[in-house]
A protein has these predicted regions:
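An acidic/histidine-cluster motif and surrounding catalytic segment
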Residues: 1-94, 105-131
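Periplasmic solute-binding protein
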Residues: 102
Length: 131
């Protein structure tokens, strides 16, 4: 994981999404740590591949901020997902970064229509990253 490459990719994506001054933090960790975060903050048991913690909850009364929030990725889960899908670890990590970023921007996948929209945007942004 090259932090410089990750930063460069995210800058391109944020520019494409017209989030020019946006900031976010990224933590690449393991299953144990992400499971602790998942339990503590979301009351869910076990590890997951990515967590997103938005700073704003789309409340119009909240002050405007350039900080979007935090993205946490389990490298252990990313490796398992990459093996399962046949994607490279780099592409899977890019996919999880985009997924987390879209959550920070308010995308959701609780309903099928939202899931479809989020998946479509993920694929579009992945394609842009590969160019």
């Amino acid at each position: 994981m090259d932090p410089g490459k990750i930063k460069m990719k995210l800058k391109r994506i944020l520019k494409d999404l017209e989030c020019h001054d946006a900031e976010l933090s990224i933590l690449i960790t393991d299953d144990k740590h992400i499971a602790e975060l998942n339990s503590r903050f979301l009351k869910r048991k076990g590890p997951t591949n990515v967590l997103a913690f938005p700073i704003r909850e789309n409340d119009p009364n909240e002050p405007e901020t350039s900080m979007l929030g935090d993205i946490v990725i389990s490298l252990d889960a990313a490796m398992r997902d990459a093996i399962k899908t046949g994607e490279s670890l780099t592409k899977m990590t890019d996919r999880l970064l985009i997924h987390g970023l879209l959550h920070l921007l308010g995308y959701n996948h609780e309903r099928s229509e939202e899931a479809w929209r989020m998946e479509e945007e993920t694929e579009r942004l992945l394609g842009m990253m590969e160019r």
